[in-house]
């Protein structure tokens, strides 16, 4: 069983607000829909490069899209 990552994100909320489907967003950042689903659900941590790409799609900084608990 895959252990969920500690990194959380608001990608699904941002994607839905932007009126994008999972397939559309996945295509814009060059990953499969399945990979995007895993990232949205916290089952997969994206690479730093992919995190930047996702953030830029929404015009936000990485820390606005991804959160890592302190401590």
Spans of features found by a protein language model:
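A short, Lys/Arg-rich alpha-helix, primarily the initiator
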Residues: 1-17
């Amino acid at each position: 069983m895959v252990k969920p990552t500690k990194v959380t994100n608001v990608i699904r909320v941002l994607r839905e607000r932007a009126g994008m489907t999972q397939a559309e967003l996945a295509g814009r950042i060059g990953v499969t829909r399945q990979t995007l689903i895993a990232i949205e659900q916290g089952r997969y941590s994206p690479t730093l490069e992919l995190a930047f790409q996702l953030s830029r799609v929404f015009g936000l900084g990485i820390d606005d899209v991804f959160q890592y608990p302190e401590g």
